[in-house]
């Protein structure tokens, strides 16, 4: 068997009849499967042991040879080879057909390959193949044309008229004759000439035909192989037949389909031997053709063949297609051994790198390790008795288990795994009970809660896998979120509430007492002299003088209070206690700790202390937070929800105003639309007033207020609904109902108010489930389009980059600073201080936060950085163009699968995006798509709803109106002008006399990215897509780094469309990879020919995924049969560069530690090294 790691590429093509016979171990002649009495396979049937191998290991059919010593002998009685039974998964058979039949993929696919190469319409071809018409194969010297169709009557007439002077036939035989006669080289030449000379539909048709002809020419496939003479029979264990209890059999649908083919084939042979009348033979041939069609792709033509209960049978094509097909079910995702799942509960006592594993589960997962150790330690004599000990759970087993799991990490995974933080490694700690315990701080990454969530455990087995889990995947090493580089293990909920309560001061500002040392203050607190929240003054100590300042010991000394050492500070007892658990480098934070501050602390810790210490630091804050959340006794009682006193007054005022508006409307002073808008505005304002009085009246130590202000749970709008008023509600279509809900939940709603608010609730629930599905599908497409983007080299040497400029509004306020766009990126050129002339950042140096600050301080408004959009690496990107790896904060390593990370970073927050489409109200009823559908629209490069008109050249605008139609004319400086007519109801964004640039929007709406590509070129459309996607995410408060979106945009713009092939081998109208296009042109120019001309194309992510070089990746994505048909005809070779292809064939992925450059590193465990060392000493 060929080792999977030793081949570089995999090729697919058409199989010739000889090839199929070569694969086969014998012909299946009978439709029988197994004998109903003996339950052994019938000879020459679909499960025949002589063809496919024995059903039991080392045993022939008749039982003459049993046992392994007869290995390889072929039994002289029954003809079965004595070998392993698993050959029944590998050996194929074949069926010799009495008449050739066509392969439905090549005849029925769109476009029909057979029809194109013969230049016959698919409908005419269908008539011939299914015996409804004759086709002339050789007109001889008659006036008939080759490939002319004749009806039954016409055929008879011409036969009587011309006798045997012409040849005509029907069915696949006739088509085969035509296919064998084709001269591909000559056809290719004629078609190339035709493409150059004709235009319109004929040109398109010729181009399509040329593509198919070229495919056959280059691949070495023969066109007549599209007609089958022999049919391969797949191995029986891949279409099994199993006995159910009750003596009935369950069988794979393929057996039924094969059986029909064999029955019809045998009947046809018999009829031919008998010399039956032509009409009967013809009918039988047609039925054979239909049976083979059903076997290959049931339901592609006509009604599908159904089994019991009217269920269509699953054909060979269905076995590959869809989520349950071979690709997605068995090749891309397999079930694995050494895994288990259980409910999760919180483990607040755990360290960040630990998880609690139930004893029983651990024993089962680590069984082989435990058994080996039991034998090695002499507790058991052999593996069998060790196994018995484990099964009986003897006491010594538990001690051995403790030893085995020490230092052996396990992987925990929670479905759905939306990003790479959904699988992390932990050191197991054995716990009683049957629930897995997880650390509270990793819940954010897993998006886990404890309302019954389950998680799966996997055990990495090999030394390499363990090393990877420990070094790369340990939870304590995954502190930053790859999507934005922010810490993902920030303490929240109870921990945050505890820290907030602890650091919250009393409203009075005078210090209650003064202390000479923190310990003294602590003593006073413990003796009840001061409270946690009292303002006090404390003098903080300094680290001992004998320690060298800024040395490791100096920093680690508990008396080092950093910024406040040796000073007297006004603070609270609680804040002092909080700072005590902080590392000296982070002190002293004299603030009330809420969500933002907590994030800042973790961020500072990561930058100043590194990974390991940050993990320790978060654990300390976690413990402190839990302790004081408990101590605070913060609960919600109904008395904590206080309704503001002047609510009634505000409502009365609002009602008065609404009455006034209604009166104005009845008098005809305002339109209904204005009345509606006014009423909505009045109630919104009333609600805001209630909210602001509510905020003023709430006390600092009110638990509801503490939860909200700390950011632990709830927001101001929820509290307004509890204690203020619920306000306006939307109806099912999203329109706001002008009747507000005046009550709050504390007072209780009336029946009508309750009913009004149910609309919104239902919409919310429906939206959530729809959103989850859509978001998952979007992620799948993103992963597919970018899965082969891997960091392949250090520097691609490009001279291009993208320039970010600070954006300011007309008053000089900065709308968009450049800092977020340039941090973590590599500078293209030296960045020089405009006044002093010193170089702040050298070319090819990464810009970190400090350098970005310096750039900002120097007043530099424009920076050019390296970007993946301009990267010149062929099958991926280079380190310099990608910049910082956000999960580590350092420059990305070669081998990082940045495409997948980008897809996850965009897809994971997708569930948070809304589904709603906004209503602008009034006449302009064009909904502006927002939220998730907008992201999808952008990535799929669709024509947007509510499309804006864009300027096609730079120039001055003039707006004219005639007969109620508005027109915008743009006149450029050289006198050229373009006029656009504005559709009714569109809102114009420009004024007469204004100067616009090409690509600017003239009316409101979304721009069609294809138009933008035409007008502004690559750079313009890249900018636009990046901006628009960011806009949607920013609206929801989701922060995603530019580089992730850039990777997607780069993949969408990888192809060019050939306009004129010149002297190249490229096909006109074909899509080619930019790099292949450049190579081909370079080759032609070197030979002195005319290069090809092409224009860049923007493909949606689905199209781009299917247009990849890898047919395995494309076939496993969507439209499996179409992709495989195309690949087979072209004889495509898959270079196995991406991740999916390698997973499918079972190789290590070419990313991370699976890259070629890391292949020859071998890992040793300490014991191995120690043993070798001892051996060396003995020698």
From Swiss-Prot:
Tell me one GO biological process term.
Answer: DNA-templated transcription
Q: Name one GO cellular component term.
A: DNA-directed RNA polymerase complex
Bound how, and how many: what does the cofactor note say?
Answer: Binds 1 Mg(2+) ion per subunit.
Q: Which CDD domains match?
A: RNAP_beta'_C, RNAP_beta'_N
UniProt EC number: 2.7.7.6
| Binding-site list for Zn(2+) 2 | 796, 871, 878, 881
Sites binding Mg(2+) sit at: 449, 451, 453
Keywords, sorted A to Z = DNA-directed RNA polymerase, Magnesium, Metal-binding, Nucleotidyltransferase, Transcription, Transferase, Zinc
Into which EC class is this enzyme placed? transferase
Cofactor requirement: Mg(2+); Zn(2+)
User: Which reactions fall under this protein's catalytic activity?
Assistant: RNA(n) + a ribonucleoside 5'-triphosphate = RNA(n+1) + diphosphate
Binding-site residues, Zn(2+) 1: 60, 62, 75, 78
From what superkingdom does this record's organism come? Bacteria
Record GO terms (molecular function):
DNA binding; DNA-directed RNA polymerase activity; magnesium ion binding; zinc ion binding
Q: How does it assemble?
A: The RNAP catalytic core consists of 2 alpha, 1 beta, 1 beta' and 1 omega subunit. When a sigma factor is associated with the core the holoenzyme is formed, which can initiate transcription.
Give the record's family classification: Belongs to the RNA polymerase beta' chain family.
Role of this protein = DNA-dependent RNA polymerase catalyzes the transcription of DNA into RNA using the four ribonucleoside triphosphates as substrates.
Q: What NCBIfam families would the database entry show?
A: PRK14906.1, rpoC_TIGR
Q: What is this protein called?
A: DNA-directed RNA polymerase subunit beta'
Q: Which organism encodes this protein?
A: Symbiobacterium thermophilum (strain DSM 24528 / JCM 14929 / IAM 14863 / T)
GN (gene name): rpoC
């Amino acid at each position: 068997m060929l080792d999977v790691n030793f081949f570089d590429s995999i090729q697919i093509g058409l199989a010739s009849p000889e090839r199929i016979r070569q694969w086969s171990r014998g012909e299946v002649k009978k439709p029988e499967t197994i004998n109903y009495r003996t339950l052994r396979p019938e000879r020459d049937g679909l499960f025949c042991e002589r063809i496919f191998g024995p059903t039991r290991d080392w045993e022939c059919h008749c039982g003459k040879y049993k046992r392994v010593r007869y290995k390889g002998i072929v039994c002289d009685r029954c003809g079965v080879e004595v070998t392993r039974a698993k050959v029944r998964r590998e050996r194929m058979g074949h069926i010799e057909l009495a008449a050739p039949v066509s392969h439905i993929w090549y005849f029925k696919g769109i476009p029909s390959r057979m029809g194109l190469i013969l230049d016959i319409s698919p409908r005419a071809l269908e008539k011939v193949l299914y015996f409804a018409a004759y086709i002339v194969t050789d007109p001889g010297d008659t006036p008939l044309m080759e490939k002319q169709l004749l009806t039954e009557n016409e055929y008879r007439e011409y036969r009587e008229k011309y006798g045997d002077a012409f040849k005509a036939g029907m069915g696949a035989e006739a088509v085969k004759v035509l296919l064998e006669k084709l001269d591909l080289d000559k056809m290719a030449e004629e078609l190339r000439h035709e493409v150059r000379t004709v235009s319109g539909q004929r040109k398109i048709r010729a181009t399509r035909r040329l593509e198919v002809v070229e495919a056959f020419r280059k691949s070495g496939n023969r066109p007549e192989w599209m007609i089958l003479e022999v049919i391969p029979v797949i191995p029986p264990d891949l279409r099994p037949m199993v006995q159910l209890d009750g003596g009935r059999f369950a069988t794979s649908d393929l057996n039924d389909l094969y059986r029909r083919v064999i029955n019809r084939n045998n009947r046809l042979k018999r009829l031919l031997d008998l010399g039956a009348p032509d009409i009967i033979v013809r009918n039988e041939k047609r039925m054979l053709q239909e049976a083979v069609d059903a076997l290959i792709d049931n339901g592609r033509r006509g009604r599908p063949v159904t089994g019991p209960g009217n269920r269509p049978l699953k054909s060979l094509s269905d076995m590959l297609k869809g989520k349950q097909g071979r690709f997605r079910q068995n090749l891309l995702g397999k079930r694995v051994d050494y895994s288990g799942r259980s409910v999760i509960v919180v483990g607040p006592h755990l360290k960040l790198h630990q998880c609690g594993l139930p004893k029983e589960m651990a024993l089962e997962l680590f069984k082989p390790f435990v058994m080996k150790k039991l034998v090695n330690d002499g507790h058991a004599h052999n593996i069998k008795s060790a196994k018995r000990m484990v099964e009986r759970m003897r006491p010594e087993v538990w001690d051995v288990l403790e030893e085995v799991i020490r230092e052996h990490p396990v992987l925990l995974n929670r479905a759905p795994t939306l990003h790479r933080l959904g699988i992390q490694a932990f050191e197991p700690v054995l716990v009683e009970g049957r629930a897995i315990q997880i650390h509270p701080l990793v819940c954010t990454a897993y998006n886990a809660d404890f309302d019954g969530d389950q998680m799966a455990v996997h055990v990495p087995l090999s030394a390499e896998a363990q090393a990877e889990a420990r070094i790369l995947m340990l939870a304590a090493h995954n502190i930053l979120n790859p999507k934005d580089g922010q810490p993902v293990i920030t303490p929240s909920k109870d921990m945050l509430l505890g820290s907030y309560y602890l650091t919250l001061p009393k409203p009075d500002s005078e210090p209650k007492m003064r202390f000479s040392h923190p310990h003294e203050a602590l003593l006073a607190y413990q003796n009840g002299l001061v409270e946690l929240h009292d303002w006090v003054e404390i003098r903080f100590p300094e680290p001992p003088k004998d320690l060298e300042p800024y040395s490791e010991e100096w920093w680690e000394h508990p008396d080092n209070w950093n910024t406040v050492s040796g000073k007297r500070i006004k603070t609270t007892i609680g804040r002092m206690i909080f700072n005590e658990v902080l590392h000296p480098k982070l002190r002293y934070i004299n603030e009330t700790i809420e969500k933002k501050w907590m994030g800042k602390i973790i961020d500072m810790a990561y930058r100043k202390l590194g990974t390991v210490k940050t993990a320790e630091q978060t654990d300390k804050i976690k413990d402190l937070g839990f302790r004081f959340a408990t101590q605070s006794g913060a609960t919600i009682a109904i008395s904590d929800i206080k309704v503001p006193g002047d609510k009634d007054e505000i409502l009365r005022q609002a009602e008065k105003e609404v009455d006034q508006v209604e009166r104005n409307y009845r008098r005809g002073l305002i339109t209904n639309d204005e009345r509606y808008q006014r009423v909505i505005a009045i109630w919104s304002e009333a609600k805001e007033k209630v909210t602001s009085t509510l905020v003023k009246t709430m006390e600092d130590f009110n638990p509801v207020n503490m939860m909200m202000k700390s950011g632990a749970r709830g927001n101001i709008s929820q509290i307004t609904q509890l204690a203020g008023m619920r306000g306006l509600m939307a109806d099912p279509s999203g329109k706001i109902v002008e009747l507000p809900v005046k009550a709050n939940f504390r007072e209780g709603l009336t029946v009508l108010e309750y009913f009004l608010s149910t609309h919104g609730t239902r919409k919310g629930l429906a939206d959530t489930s729809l959103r989850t599905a859509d978001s998952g599908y979007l992620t799948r497409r993103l992963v597919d389009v970018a899965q082969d983007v891997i960091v392949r080299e250090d520097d691609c040497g490009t001279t291009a980059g993208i320039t970010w400029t600070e954006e300011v509004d007309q008053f000089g306020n900065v709308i968009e600073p450049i800092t977020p766009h340039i941090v973590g990126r590599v500078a293209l050129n030296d960045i020089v201080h405009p006044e002093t002339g010193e170089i702040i950042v050298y070319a090819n140096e990464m810009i970190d936060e400090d350098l970005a600050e310096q750039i900002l301080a120097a007043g530099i408004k424009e920076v050019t950085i390296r970007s993946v959009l301009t990267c010149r690496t062929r099958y991926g990107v280079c380190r310099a163009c990608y910049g910082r790896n956000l999960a580590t904060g350092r420059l990305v390593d070669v081998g990082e699968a940045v495409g997948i990370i980008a897809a996850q970073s965009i897809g994971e927050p997708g569930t948070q995006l809304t589904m709603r489409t906004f209503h602008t109200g009034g006449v302009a009823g064009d909904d502006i798509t927002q939220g998730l559908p907008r992201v999808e629209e952008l990535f799929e490069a669709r024509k947007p709803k509510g499309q804006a008109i864009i300027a096609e050249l730079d120039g001055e605008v003039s707006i004219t109106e005639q007969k109620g139609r508005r027109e915008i004319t743009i006149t450029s400086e050289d006198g050229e002008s373009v006029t656009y007519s504005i559709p009714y109801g569109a809102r114009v964004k420009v004024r007469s006399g204004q100067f616009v640039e090409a690509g600017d929007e003239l009316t409101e709406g979304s721009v069609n990215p294809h138009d933008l590509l035409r007008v502004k070129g690559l750079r313009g459309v890249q900018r636009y897509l990046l901006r628009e996607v960011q806009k949607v995410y920013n609206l929801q408060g989701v922060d995603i780094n530019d580089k992730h979106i850039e990777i997607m945009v780069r993949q969408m713009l990888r192809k060019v469309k050939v306009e004129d092939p010149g002297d190249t081998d490229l096909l006109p109208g074909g899509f080619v990879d930019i790099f292949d296009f450049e190579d081909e042109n370079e080759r032609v120019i070197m030979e002195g020919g005319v290069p090809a001309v092409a224009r860049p194309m923007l493909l949606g992510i689905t199209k781009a995924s299917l247009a990849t070089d890898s047919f395995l990746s494309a076939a496993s994505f969507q439209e499996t049969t179409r992709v495989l048909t195309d690949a087979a005809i072209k004889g495509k070779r898959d270079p196995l560069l991406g991740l999916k292809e390698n997973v499918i064939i079972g190789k290590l992925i070419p990313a991370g530690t699976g890259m070629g450059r890391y292949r020859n590193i071998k890992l040793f465990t300490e014991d191995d090294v120690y043993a070798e060392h001892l051996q060396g000493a003995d020698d």
